[in-house]
Amino acid sequence: MSLLNTLLGDPPPAWAFEISESGIAFGRTATPGDVSFRPLPEGAISVSPLRDNVQLPDVLAREVAALAPPDAHHHHRAALILPDYCARTAVLDFDAFPANHDEQRALISFRIRKTVPFDLESAIVSHYVQPAATGEKIDVVVALVPQEIVIRYETPFRTAGFQPGEVTTSAMAALHMVKPEGITMLAKLAGLTLSVMVLRGSTLKLARCVELPEATSAEILSVLCPSVAYIEDELLARPEKLLLCGFGRVGDEEAPLWRGELGVEVEPVRSRYGMPSSTNAGLLGYMESLAA
């Protein structure tokens, strides 16, 4: 399900890190239940798809260096999980999809060029062709992020002795905490960024990431309601479950209202490795993917 750039059969990286505006969640993949968090000063990271996210590079470099093991000069392989809003993730459907990689990229670029707010020529583009039954449309998951943004996130880790060979986004990694049953909606709130992912079984059907003016129940519903309506139109069925992550008290208090407004069961997303939050959901999901 994820767009991690992993070669089949490769062992997992030794470390995994998730970056947010609040800090760095991290852990060793050999001990997935032992996840920690190191806060960052306010303003060190400011997430955007349009500009450099690392506003205080010296501060980020110092905090990452503090996480490095004593033998950091050995270059430990690491997975790096980026904030959702610095990238763009979409699900494109095709009646037919070419087998040639270059033709695939050209077709994807043609379809998505006018929908992203940055230059495709300077972006890193990954795509995953999801399995489809004969006669069904082919759903392709596409993730794009400006190359310079990725480089700026990776640099302090490389300097500290880590080798971030795998890069994904928080919501994409968090999908590994969702059991592939029926139609499920995952909603993840991180600050004012709301990510919505909809799965039918293990197939991703919708990916949205919206910056809210404020994290109120009304603003959240203004994103969730159209998402449910879209799924009803496209899949001819309502989501059976809404999984919440990062909503804190708002989610606890508003869950009954959302259940009534959306007509779906509402519950928190869960992981065997801890309580998923706005700062570690991607990390815990990544750990779940290694255990699968």
Residue ranges and their predicted role:
Residues 1-292:
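Hydrophobic/aromatic-enriched cytosolic interaction surfaces used to assemble or bind macromolecules
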